[in-house]
A protein has these predicted regions:
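Histone-fold modules and their flanking histone-like tails across chromatin and transcription assemblies
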Residues: 1-3
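N-terminal interaction modules that seed assembly of large macromolecular complexes
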Residues: 6-62
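Surface-exposed polar/charged interaction patches
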Residues: 15, 19, 45, 66-70, ...
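Intrinsic-disorder-associated interaction segments
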Residues: 9, 53-56, 69, 85, ...
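Short, surface-exposed, charged/polar-biased interaction segments
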Residues: 29, 33, 37, 56-63, ...
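Amphipathic alpha-helical binding modules
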Residues: 93-143
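Aromatic-anchored, charged helix-turn/loop surface patch used as a conserved interaction hotspot
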Residues: 42-89
């Protein structure tokens, strides 16, 4: 989820400490609605945040393992193989995010390579992983 929960909580504290009642009841009511929505999103993220990141990282690594044998660029192939062999050492969100960001940067590199080299099957596999990632991160406000 972006922004991350610490950012949402800090913003909430700023809103509450900033004297929202000074601007009138309508403004305060709007701010409280916004804060309530942010807290609901934070609760949902808290519940599923680690699971989403672990699944994404696993899917990306599996994709790299599948793509690497077809890559002719030696440097990219080595990066894909190294990333595919990696694993998440911690379930801390900050550590999972760091791994996820690094994997996503390499995924972008792999996608550019696939597009530049007409590797349509690789492109389709990449898009399937991206679609699954987007579906996992979808946030619904209802129950």
């Amino acid at each position: 989820m972006n922004p991350e929960i610490p950012t949402i909580l800090a913003l909430t504290m700023q809103r509450l400490a900033g004297g929202i009642t000074e601007h009138g009841a309508a403004f305060a009511q709007g701010q409280m609605g916004l804060i309530g929505m942010m807290m609901t999103l934070s609760a949902k993220e808290y519940e599923r945040g680690a699971e989403i990141r672990v699944a994404e990282n696993s899917d990306i690594r599996a994709l790299f393992a599948a793509l690497a044998p077809e890559v002719k660029d030696a440097a990219l192939k080595a990066k894909l193989e190294a990333a595919a062999a990696g694993k998440d050492e911690s379930l801390l969100i900050s550590k999972l995010n760091a791994n996820n960001y690094a994997l996503r940067r390499l995924l972008t590199e792999a996608q550019v390579y696939a597009e530049d080299n007409g590797a349509r099957a690789a492109e389709q596999r990449i898009w399937a992983v991206l679609k699954a990632m987007a579906a996992r991160r979808l946030v619904q406000l209802g129950p």
